[in-house]
Every structure is written in C-alpha cells, then in structure tokens.
C-alpha cells in the first residue's frame, strides 16, 4: 500500500507521522525508539500503545518527526499521530482504537499568566491591614 501521512498534537508538541506496510521499523527524529528515549519504559509503552492495541507491531513501518515540547508531550503527540495514521491506513482500526481514547486530541495545555498575578492563578499574599 501507499504511504499514509497524519499529524498528532499534545500541549505544544506536533508529530508528523508517515506510515506504510513493512516489517515493524519505528524511527523518531531519525533514531530508533530506544535511542530517542533512552531508558524511559513508560513513555515507550505510550508510543507503542496504538500498535499494540491494533496488533500491528510487526506489519507497518513508521517514520515520526516531532517538534516542540518535552519528551513526554512529544511521545503523546507521536501516539496520537500513529493512531490517526492507522485509521487513514485502514478504516477498520477506528473501532479498535476509539474505545481506548487514542483518537481523541488531549486538549489540556498551559493556562496563560494573568496580569496582576504571579502565575496563572497564584495571587500575591493578601494583607488585611
């Protein structure tokens, strides 16, 4: 089959994902998953979750380019992008991935700082007198 393109997002991170049928290779920013993340097993599991749920670990090749944010947000953006790419690759994966919430964009992001306050919600100490 042809290459499929999808994007995933989380916080300020964006992941561009290309998926094609193959033998299970996964490269993120030109590196293997182990080289990119080092010893973060929980983050590796999050990236691989859509492939594990859809049982496609060894049947597709994936190339991911990530921009912005930290490792955790980039990993979640990659997970979102891989899920969307699987659905674009074959529509039957939608019914498999949807119950796990893998196709839903996590809209939580940092709340902006307001003027007159120290942070988004933290006020300066109140003095009664």
Curated annotation (Swiss-Prot):
One annotated GO molecular function: RNA binding
PROSITE patterns noted in UniProt: RIBOSOMAL_S9
Database matches in HAMAP family: Ribosomal_uS9_B
GO BP terms: translation
UniProt keyword list: Ribonucleoprotein, Ribosomal protein
Lineage start: Bacteria, Pseudomonadati, Campylobacterota, Epsilonproteobacteria, Campylobacterales
Name assigned to this protein: Small ribosomal subunit protein uS9
One GO cellular component, as annotated: cytosolic small ribosomal subunit
Family from the record: Belongs to the universal ribosomal protein uS9 family.
Organism of provenance: Aliarcobacter butzleri (strain RM4018) (Arcobacter butzleri)
NCBIfam families named among the record's database cross-references: PRK00132.1 (NF001099)
Keyword Ribosomal protein: yes
